From Swiss-Prot:
Keywords: ATP-binding, Cytoplasm, DNA damage, DNA excision, DNA repair, Excision nuclease, Nucleotide-binding, SOS response. SMART domains: DEXDc, HELICc. This is UvrABC system protein B. It comes from Francisella tularensis subsp. tularensis (strain SCHU S4 / Schu 4). Residues 25-413 form the Helicase ATP-binding domain. ATP binds at G38, V39, T40, G41, S42, G43, K44, T45. A motif (Beta-hairpin) lies at residues 91-114. Belongs to the UvrB family. Pfam families: Helicase_C, ResIII, UVR, UvrB, UvrB_inter. One of its GO terms (biological process) is nucleotide-excision repair.
Length: 668
């Protein structure tokens, strides 16, 4: 059994040792709910990593957005390089859900763009949690959305073993049932190809490695891992397990039962509409559902098969759908990061989904069973949680009331104090901001500015730019990858000032930022509540010179509470430093490591590395004419690129490789 192995140069310090010990004791004594109340920059992620190391429990970490999830994923990848650290977020780059607007009689068909790399990582996550114990999955709200049933999923595995009697034809049939497609021309994820008695499978959960199975009659003679692009053999295996290409799979027998269940439900629904005099709806549901049934019979799936997920899993009406949480073993640990934001987000998903789906059901676009393809209700989510740790600098009343053990982590290992807080009048906020920015730039510090509206973000950015400030803005219209890149560029000093609204709060790690400016701090509300202000002020707590300036004409209750709490923590930290002779020092994490190990950036790096594999292609590993043609095209593309870059020696080497492939396979 694989064990978690925490790799780090640092020992726990500050409040970390007592926090780790208290949380571990709580887990070992069976406490269900604990809270880690840790100030910004106190090393909460490192504390989590130590708890996982000491308890040796598989762990699901929940975050409230992709940016924070990517940061957590990259940090845990560094802490546990020898273990399975996985990433489970929405795989849609673009998503327009199916909907019907009754007022205008408008049906909007589902339209989406799936990110294949993220889809592969989701499949990799469920595979890892089913195969091994040393697994950490970092997930967003996607964790509570319907997924294929784990029991059905496990029944559809293809087990391969050297010396086993299986047969090439039987293996292909099984792969098709698992939603793999045969493609001898374009060997890509979720497909297989056959050359003589050699079967190559590109597992849907694999990023670049494929499995080669060699048969002798019906017996498996050899199994090996190959590079999917070059076909170069990487290592031999005695056995291998292939997981389905999608989470929504079922056996042939189960599909036959499902089809009968769909027909039965359709009959009842048509009867209901006809009785109500809704003949258009009756015709619509019959036509659409019969088409889906035909697709399932012919291909094994249909567009929108997730709407039949309750029938596929055999669950009763109203039962919670299977989700990622169902894939977790009983001894798993759940950590909810930034719980004061994450839990309300999870709680709000069900009702929004229900109102949209109800229209589809009421007007004959979907059967009533589609209502059970949904996110979990909050009480269902609560009931499914194993032992849980809520992590936040500002936990909400819900977590504090649930908690059987609340652990405070106020002292930072770095000795850093909470920032100084100043209040200045609103009338001078723009001019004063410009003055503070110039002072910060002179000290090579970065500046964050938070405002209340998108319009103000853009106007302020334009104003600062006109006054010679190198500035960028960040708001909800900017996609995940660009957001990560913007934060990376700020830390690198590509620009000096970042303006935003609510995207500068939880979890973002930017120790280079020394000044925070909060515009209109006295406007009571969601973005200027006590907890929001504490979180926002925390963005400059990782810098030894960190200071926050609140622009306000009156000091609101929220402002006063936030300033009092910041001062309380600052005094405790200062006393600890004096007692232990600690001098506060900014700790700068490696910027490129954090960026490069995020999933979106890994995808870019993988594409850049493909050309290196093409250059290194093993001619002896090429199977047949089709693959040879594909390799020649890739090599010719690289040759032209090298020639364009005036790298003629490399271009000549590639030309010789092309000649070698042609001589072997095409005889030219």
């Amino acid at each position: 059994m694989n064990k978690f192995n925490l790799v780090t140069k640092y020992a726990p310090a500050g409040d970390q040792p007592q926090a780790i010990q208290s949380l571990v004791n709580g887990i070992n004594t069976g406490l269900q709910h604990q809270v880690l109340l840790g100030v910004t920059g106190s090393g909460k992620t490192y504390t989590m990593a130590n708890v996982i190391q000491q308890t040796q429990k598989p762990c699901l970490i929940l975050a409230h957005n992709k940016t924070l999830a990517a940061q957590l994923y990259s940090e845990f990848k560094q802490y546990f390089p020898d273990n399975a650290v996985e990433y489970f977020v929405s795989y849609y780059d673009y998503y327009q859900p199916e909907a019907y607007i009754a007022a205008s009689d408008t049906y909007i068909e589902k339209d989406s763009s799936v990110n294949e790399h993220i889809e592969q990582m989701r499949l990799s996550a469920t595979k890892a949690i089913l195969e091994r114990n040393d697994v950490i999955i970092v997930a967003t709200v996607s964790a509570i959305y319907g997924l294929g049933d784990p029991e059905q999923y496990m029944q559809m595995l293809l087990h391969l073993k050297v010396g086993e009697e299986l047969g090439l034809k039987k293996a292909q049939t099984k792969l098709v049932e698992m939603q793999y497609s045969r493609n001898d021309m374009d060997f890509s994820r979720g497909s297989f190809r056959v050359r003589g008695e050699v079967l190559d499978i590109f597992p849907a959960d694999s990023e670049k490695d494929a499995i080669r199975v060699e048969f002798f009659d019906d017996e498996i003679e050899a199994i090996s891992v190959i590079d999917s692009l070059t076909s170069k053999k990487l290592k031999s295996l005695h056995r291998a397990t292939i997981f389905p290409s999608t989470h929504y799979v079922a056996s042939k027998e189960r599909k036959e039962i499902v089809i009968e269940d769909i027909k039965k439900e359709l009959k009842e629904r048509v009867k209901y509409f006809e009785k109500e005099g809704k003949l258009l709806e009756a015709q619509r549901i019959e036509q659409r559902t019969k088409y889906d049934i035909e697709m399932i019979q012919e291909l094994g799936y249909c567009t929108g098969i997730e709407n039949y997920s309750r029938l596929l899993s055999g669950r009763a009406p109203g039962y919670p759908p299977p989700t990622l949480i169902d894939y977790l073993p009983e001894n798993a640990l759940v950590i909810v990061d930034e719980s004061h934001v994450t839990l309300p987000q999870f709680g709000g998903m069900y009702k929004g989904d229900l109102s949209r789906k109800s229209n589809l059901v009421n007007y004959g676009f979907r059967l009533p069973s589609a209502l059970d393809n949904r996110p979990l209700k909050f009480n269902e989510f609560e009931s499914l949680l194993p032992q849980t740790i809520y992590v936040s600098a500002t936990p909400a009343n819900y977590e504090l009331e649930k908690s059987q053990n609340t652990v405070q982590q106020v002292i930072r290992p770095t000795g850093l104090l909470d920032p100084e807080v100043f209040v200045r009048p609103v009338a001078i906020q723009v001019e004063d901001a410009l003055s503070e920015i110039n002072k910060a730039i002179a000290k090579e510090e970065r500046v964050l500015i938070t405002t209340l509206t998108k319009k103000m973000v853009e106007n302020l950015t334009e104003y600062l730019s006109e006054h010679g400030v190198n500035v960028r803005y960040l708001h909800s219209d900017i996609d995940t990858v660009e957001r990560v890149q913007i934060i990376h560029d700020l830390r690198h000093g590509v620009f000096d000032v970042l303006v935003g609204i609510n995207l500068l709060r939880e979890g973002l790690d930017m120790p280079e930022v020394g000044v925070l400016l909060i515009f209109d701090a006295d406007k009571e509300g969601f973005l200027r509540s006590e907890k929001s202000l504490i979180q926002t002020i925390g963005r400059v707590a990782r810098n030894q010179n960190g200071r926050a300036i609140l622009y306000a004409d009156v000091v609101t209750k929220s402002m006063q509470k936030a300033m009092d709490e910041t001062l309380r923590r600052r005094k405790l930290q200062d006393e600890y430093n004096q007692k232990h002779n600690i001098v506060p020092k900014t700790i700068i994490k490696n910027i490129d490591d954090m960026l490069d190990s995020s999933p979106e950036m890994q995808k870019r790096a993988y594409k850049n590395n493909l050309r290196l594999k093409v250059d290194d292609v093993d001619v002896s590993a090429i199977l047949g004419m089709t693959e040879a043609t594909k390799v020649i095209k890739a090599l010719e593309k690289r040759m032209r690129a090298y020639a364009k870059e005036l790298e003629f020696e490399k271009a000549t080497t590639i030309r010789d490789k092309i000649t070698e492939v042609k001589q072997k396979f095409i005889n030219l």
